[in-house]
């Protein structure tokens, strides 16, 4: 990787960390440099704990075998909770969307995480996400309702359309979050009140 002139005066371990941090979403070279020098000044325990947490993240976290949310076990905490309504499944694009919906406190069903959306221009088709796994699940489990909670943008709406068409013959009620979420936004950034209202006001597709 070509290094800016101002980085060439720095020790190699410092340059390497700046470059690696710069690869994270939302972290530019300036922020990466500030974080690196903060860690350089920090007590040894902090960078060591951070390194261990990063290693643990990749070694100990996996996808739930049922809904594809993140977990340390075969089933995630939501799927393993008998108090959740097993007959309702909310379909979201990413794990952070589950966190956003849970924050509302109004939803007590299960989830299905697609890990993406249908976006042909980005090379993302139904085979690249957990689309068909949802269909298999609806066939195998006594699910009465599928709530489609993909993002209110072009790709999210396209994904919702394809999901509705595929789910229609399977017998479950298919609903979509009510209008009111900011168009073009991501579910994870919606405030809990607005998202909760969209869930409670969901409409038939």
Swiss-Prot record:
Residues 87-182 form the Toprim domain. GO terms for molecular function: DNA binding; zinc ion binding. Pfam families: RecR_C, RecR_HhH, RecR_ZnF, Toprim_4. A zinc finger (C4-type) spans 64-79. GO terms for biological process: DNA recombination; DNA repair. Coiled coil: none annotated. InterPro entries: DNA_Rcmb_RecR, Rcmb_RecR, Rcmb_RecR_Znf, TOPRIM_dom, TOPRIM_RecR. Keywords: DNA damage, DNA recombination, DNA repair, Metal-binding, Zinc, Zinc-finger. PANTHER family: RECOMBINATION PROTEIN RECR. Belongs to the RecR family. May play a role in DNA repair. It seems to be involved in an RecBC-independent recombinational process of DNA repair. It may act with RecF and RecO. This is Recombination protein RecR. The lineage of its organism: Bacteria, Bacillati, Chloroflexota, Chloroflexia, Chloroflexales. The gene is recR.
């Amino acid at each position: 990787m070509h290094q800016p002139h101002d980085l060439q005066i720095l020790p190699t371990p410092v340059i390497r960390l700046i470059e690696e941090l710069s690869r994270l979403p939302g972290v530019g070279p300036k922020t990466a440099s500030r974080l690196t020098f903060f860690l350089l000044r920090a007590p040894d325990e902090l960078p060591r704990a951070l390194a261990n947490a990063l290693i643990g993240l990749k070694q100990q976290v996996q996808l739930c075998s049922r809904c594809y949310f993140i977990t340390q076990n075969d089933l995630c905490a939501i799927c393993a909770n008998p108090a959740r309504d097993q007959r309702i499944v909310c379909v979201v694009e990413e794990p952070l969307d589950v966190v956003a919906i849970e924050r509302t406190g109004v939803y007590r069903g299960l989830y299905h995480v697609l890990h993406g959306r249908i976006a042909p221009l980005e090379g993302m088709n139904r085979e690249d996400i957990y689309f068909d796994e949802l269909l298999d699940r609806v066939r195998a489990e006594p699910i009465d309702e599928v709530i489609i909670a993909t993002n209110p943008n072009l790709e999210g709406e396209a994904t919702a359309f394809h999901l509705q068409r595929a789910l229609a013959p399977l017998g479950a009620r298919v609903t979509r979050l009510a209008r009111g979420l900011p168009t073009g936004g991501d579910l994870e950034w919606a405030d809990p009140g607005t998202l909760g209202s969209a869930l409670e006001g969901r409409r038939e597709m």
